[in-house]
Amino acid sequence: MAALVAAAALAAAEPAPAVPQAAGSGGPTSRRDFYWLRSFLAGGIAGCCAKTTVAPLDRVKVLLQAHNRHYKHLGVLSTLRAVPQKEGYLGLYKGNGAMMIRIFPYGAIQFMAFEHYKTFITTKLGVSGHVHRLMAGSMAGMTAVICTYPLDVVRVRLAFQVKGEHTYSGIIHAFKTIYAKEGGFLGFYRGLMPTILGMAPYAGVSFFTFGTLKSVGLSYAPALLGRPSSDNPNVLVLKTHINLLCGGVAGAIAQTISYPFDVTRRRMQLGAVLPEFEKCLTMRETMKYVYGQHGIRRGLYRGLSLNYIRCIPSQAVAFTTYELMKQFFHLN
């Protein structure tokens, strides 16, 4: 999820796609043709690349957040070493297939929703500047989460399994089992409320922080921090290492604010897989249980250091790939 928020934030922070004078294939019409489809592909590719890069860390995060009995006594680095020993190196990528299926529609919905909300907030509500980016980002993130949440539930269930103790044999089997045993469609939306509450500040702060850093950087030091886009020299984009820095700062701040909701969401998503299932039926019960059993640092913020470790490489890949894809698909 973080990777896609970052990718969309990059698009948000930049000016609307410039439309040069007609010149062969680069004219106004060609730049407008299938714009949303090209945006969809750019965001999807960037998200998949970023998520695959940090998939091992995502798997470890799920195991630590939910206190899997095989790994609950270990730290981040110890778990990264223990998973390949117990499950093989592919065990670090368990659940990543479901994530790839989710990440494409997530990116498409988020990007299109962001553009729609941004326009609506600016034209109808008269709000502009960084505030409208904060509002539009929050709304777009929540919209994308609601639409793709069932896939995230399945991914988490698959990631939580360890070798020799499989409840689900694959993505399809997980969908069928959850639907049959956990209340039909409602079973796919366990933990949705803390997810939405966590996504609103996460997406909003990500858009706001990155957009502000980029705007300030390109305004005050364009020659040092920026370069012309390869598909449209009239548009300045951040240099790769500056993208990494700004994205890392935005991701770290947003993650710190929203992390307790992320922990709560994961536990609720796991549902009947956990022995303390009946104590974690609602968001309030889950947060109370985690806090009572493990406290703040080892409970509500358990695994946060892993998220910080994930943040820099994830944002780096997301921003770099998305920049390349935007230029490749003539989106600037």
Swiss-Prot record:
Xref: InterPro entries = GDC-like (IPR002167), Mit_carrier (IPR002067), Mitochondrial_sb/sol_carrier (IPR018108), Mt_carrier_dom_sf (IPR023395)
Q: What family is it from?
A: Belongs to the mitochondrial carrier (TC 2.A.29) family.
Compartments, as annotated in UniProt: Mitochondrion inner membrane
Q: Where are the transmembrane segments?
A: 37-57, 88-108, 134-154, 191-211, 244-264, 299-319
Give membrane topology per the record: Multi-pass membrane protein
One of this protein's Pfam families, by short name?
Mito_carr
Q: Which PANTHER family match?
A: SOLUTE CARRIER FAMILY 25 (PTHR24089)
- GO MF term (any one): secondary active transmembrane transporter activity
Q: Which GO terms describe its cellular component?
A: mitochondrial inner membrane; mitochondrion
Its keywords, alphabetically, are: Membrane, Mitochondrion, Mitochondrion inner membrane, Repeat, Transmembrane, Transmembrane helix, Transport
Q: Please give the name of this protein.
A: Solute carrier family 25 member 16
Instruction: Give the taxonomic lineage as stored in the record.
Output: Eukaryota, Metazoa, Chordata, Craniata, Vertebrata
Q: Which GO terms describe its biological process?
A: coenzyme A biosynthetic process
The residue spans of each Solcar repeat are 34-120, 128-216, 238-328
Principal location class: mitochondrion
The record's function comment reads: May be involved in the transport of coenzyme A in the mitochondrial matrix. Very little is known about the physiological function of this carrier.
Disulphide bonds in the chain: none
The organism's superkingdom is given as Eukaryota
